[in-house]
């Protein structure tokens, strides 16, 4: 096999030499082989219902008498549509950290546990004196759906994936917990999909009117970004 390969190489070399000699004496047709194409990664488009806006409506400050006043939970639909099957992770970044006041947010997690962890809360706004008035949390409610089938929410905070008990997003101020989805009967690793649908539950709590001055109207201005990363 080694000799045959060497002979073939020598023949090709000799032929190339003859072609060079011929081109020096007379013009010959130039026959060019072109190989074209493009390698492109899958492209995914995320979309939030209602333009990503969550409106908690009007709350009368005189009614905020508890230490942690719970606002009615809200939901948004989050969909990721890809042109080819892709694996992604999700994390969030709080754009209003100065408006965060550590609260106890009731039944915020997937397992209905309360959220009293700063890393899992986002700033909701400040009063006229610059005091933060509360916080909100963002959790994946239930099981995300791929092709009509339920999936498991998995989490990684250091390169190792495991099942998420809370389904909650961290706020990006510390170690980002990456969330993804996995097949319910397969390995605990991110799965590829073309369309992923999930419901996001947004819970919020506001401080009492004795802990924070509320003589003036307070406009909630919470803002956070969902970051999608291809895996």
Regions found by a protein language model. Name each.
Residues 9-17:
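Sec-dependent signal peptide hydrophobic core
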């Amino acid at each position: 096999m080694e000799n045959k390969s060497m002979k073939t190489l020598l023949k090709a070399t000799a032929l190339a030499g003859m072609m060079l000699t011929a081109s020096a004496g007379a013009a010959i047709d130039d026959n060019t082989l072109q190989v074209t194409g493009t390698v492109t990664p899958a492209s995914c488009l995320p979309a939030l219902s209602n333009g990503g806006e969550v409106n908690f409506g009007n709350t009368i400050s005189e009614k905020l008498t508890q230490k942690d006043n719970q606002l009615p939970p809200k939901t948004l639909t989050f969909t990721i549509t890809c042109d080819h099957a892709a694996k992604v992770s999700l994390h969030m970044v709080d754009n209003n950290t100065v408006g965060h006041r550590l609260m106890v947010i009731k039944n915020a997690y997937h397992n209905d546990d309360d959220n009293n962890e700063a890393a899992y809360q986002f700033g909701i706004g400040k009063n006229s004196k610059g005091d933060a008035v509360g916080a909100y949390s963002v959790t994946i409610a239930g099981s995300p759906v791929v092709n009509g089938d339920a999936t498991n929410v998995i989490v990684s905070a250091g390169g190792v994936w495991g099942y998420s008990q809370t389904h909650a997003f961290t706020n990006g101020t510390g170690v980002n917990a990456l969330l993804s989805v996995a097949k319910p009967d397969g390995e605990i690793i991110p799965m590829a999909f073309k369309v992923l649908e999930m419901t996001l539950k947004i819970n919020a709590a506001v401080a009492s009117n004795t802990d924070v001055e509320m003589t003036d109207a307070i406009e909630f201005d919470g803002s956070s970004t969902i970051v999608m990363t291809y895996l």
